[in-house]
Amino acid sequence: MTNKIIQQLEAEQMSKEIPAFAPGDTVIVQVKVKEGERQRLQAFEGVVIGKRNRGLNSAFTVRKISSGVGVERTFQTYSPLVDSITVKRRGDVRKAKLYYLRDLSGKAARIKEKLS
């Protein structure tokens, strides 16, 4: 009984349209940021290094290099703070988790583009 109600509520909250993306893809995530009374969108562009598919609890981690420092941010896929996700380029990788990119820098950290 309660399980069906929970599933129905989760289905309503998961109604947001999310583009298909995978680890290795370069994405631009538009995040809603509230500063005092104002609310604006902030873009976070980087490589998806991991994805967790758990229905409403799905999440993904994006890594970028900002002024020589590696920055990683984990987003909840269906969070109301995530405004939009745009796939900029597809990456050709063989692993599901790209945590090895944390140890690489410069040209070694590049990902080959998927030609389809």
From Swiss-Prot:
Organism encoding this protein: Azotobacter vinelandii (strain DJ / ATCC BAA-1303)
Full protein name: Large ribosomal subunit protein bL19
GO cellular component, one term: cytosolic large ribosomal subunit
Pfam families: Ribosomal_L19
Classification via Gene3D superfamilies: 2.30.30.790
SUPFAM superfamilies in UniProt: Translation proteins SH3-like domain (SSF50104)
Function in brief: This protein is located at the 30S-50S ribosomal subunit interface and may play a role in the structure and function of the aminoacyl-tRNA binding site.
Keywords: Ribonucleoprotein, Ribosomal protein
